[in-house]
Amino acid sequence: ASGAKGDHGGAGASTXXLLT
């Protein structure tokens, strides 16, 4: 999970908007 990057994962989904 790349949280801050927003690639994929829990926090990443919220940041980036990607719900992977």
From Swiss-Prot:
List the expressing tissues: Heart specific isoform.
- Please indicate which superkingdom the organism of origin belongs to: Eukaryota
Task: Give the start-end ranges of region Disordered.
Answer: 1-20
Q: Which pathway does UniProt place it in?
A: Energy metabolism; oxidative phosphorylation
Q: Kindly list the cysteine pairs connected by disulfide bridges.
A: none
The reply on keyword Transmembrane helix is yes
* Keywords, ordered alphabetically: Membrane, Mitochondrion, Mitochondrion inner membrane, Oxidoreductase, Transmembrane, Transmembrane helix
Compartments in which it is found: Mitochondrion inner membrane
**Membrane topology term:** Single-pass membrane protein
This protein is called Cytochrome c oxidase subunit 6A2, mitochondrial
Tell me what organism the protein belongs to.
Canis lupus familiaris (Dog)
